[in-house]
Swiss-Prot record:
The lineage of its organism: Bacteria, Pseudomonadati, Bacteroidota, Bacteroidia, Bacteroidales. It is found in: Cytoplasm. NAD(+) binds at residues 99-104. It comes from the Bacteria. Modulates transcription in response to changes in cellular NADH/NAD(+) redox state. It comes from Bacteroides thetaiotaomicron (strain ATCC 29148 / DSM 2079 / JCM 5827 / CCUG 10774 / NCTC 10582 / VPI-5482 / E50). This is Redox-sensing transcriptional repressor Rex. The gene is rex. One of its GO terms (molecular function) is DNA-binding transcription factor activity.
């Protein structure tokens, strides 16, 4: 790392959510540039690759407090390191998954999640054809065994992929059992205590946005 390049992390809770959503895009792009042999990268270079204004990129990167060289930019290796650390990708966060349907099963088979710091160590369902089996080496237990498994695993994150009708019920069970953060893939807005972290990722909502923009473009 260059001597005149300073890296210092700040309180992540002060970072706007839109910035947190963009930082992984920058990280992925910088990794691609590294594969191409680039040693330094500027906000302008990243801007051209991902079509985000260079001033916005520079502002976003200011939250992780990394300063580059004048007329040269950021050192690629240093930028990758600080972004991965800032985003929590350098540590493994263990998680339980609830609901081994099509989406849940796909997440269990997504080995790429571990590269971003998330390891699903067990899954829960009530389907007798699934309970007692494993998928991608991940054991599937009955939902009734959740509390017992919480004693065996060091888990704070729950991934919610159950039917919408039981989303709140399963969420309550998770929170009562000690889960501190919920990655919610259902279209239901779950209710949790203030100290519980919730990240809503509704595929249907993203579809609605895409369809709306597609229709708008067609009638222009």
């Amino acid at each position: 790392m260059a001597e005149n390049q300073k890296i210092q992390q700040i309180d992540c809770t002060k970072v706007p959510e839109p910035t947190l959503r963009r930082l992984p895009w920058y990280l992925s792009n910088v990794k691609l540039l590294k594969q191409r042999g680039e040693r330094f990268v500027s906000s302008t270079q990243i801007s051209k690759e991902i079509n985000i204004d260079a001033s916005q990129i520079a502002k976003d990167l200011s939250y992780v407090n990394i300063s580059g060289r004048t007329r040269v930019g950021y050192e690629v290796d240093a930028l990758i390191e600080v972004l991965e650390h800032f985003l929590g990708f350098t540590e493994i966060h263990k998680a339980f998954l609830f609901g081994v349907g099509s989406l849940g099963g796909a997440l269990l088979q997504d080995s790429g999640l571990k590269h971003f710091g998330l390891e699903i160590v067990a899954a829960f369902d009530v389907d007798p054809t699934l309970v007692g089996t494993n998928l991608n080496g991940i054991p599937i237990y009955h939902s009734d065994d959740f509390l017992k498994k919480m004693e065996e695993y060091d888990v704070q994150i729950g991934v919610l992929t159950v039917p919408i009708e039981i989303a709140q019920c399963i969420t309550d069970m998770m929170v009562d059992g000690g889960i501190k953060a919920v990655w919610n893939f259902t279209p239901f807005r779950i209710r949790v205590p203030e100290d519980i972290v919730v990240q809503n990722t509704s595929l249907y909502a993203h579809l609605a946005v895409m369809f709306n923009r597609l229709n708008f473009n067609e009638i222009k």
